[in-house]
């Protein structure tokens, strides 16, 4: 399985190297696909589950997709969700070596300062994850949670010692 924040799947899929790279995987999860309900992005040998962002805006944003190889896709089922931040897929145990179905949650949580971030939506996501984990034996969460670090910063701070040691110019120092 591979997971990637693509920041626009349609645009990325135009590059043959991008598509060819994923041939070695059975499942590919993409977040920030920026797809709408009517968009179709084909990857040869795969079929797609897609969940566009429910909240629309002027330009496309968000969105989640899972591509499964054709022979696995028939064993996959899209599960309903109340959250815009996660897409749930169940993979039947008959196609794995597990004794129960595998539940995959593909997530994209917008940055906390984004206009699309919503505390209630985050709470819904947390509740759904808790519910899935309590009702299923195998739950796998993947995606982009945008560094939810509690009270810690979610960005890199400038190290003054390194700035002096490498004699960084003012423009670089002020970037951080």
Language-model features, listed with the residues they occupy:
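A shared catalytic/ligand-binding motif for oxyanion handling
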Residues: 1-176
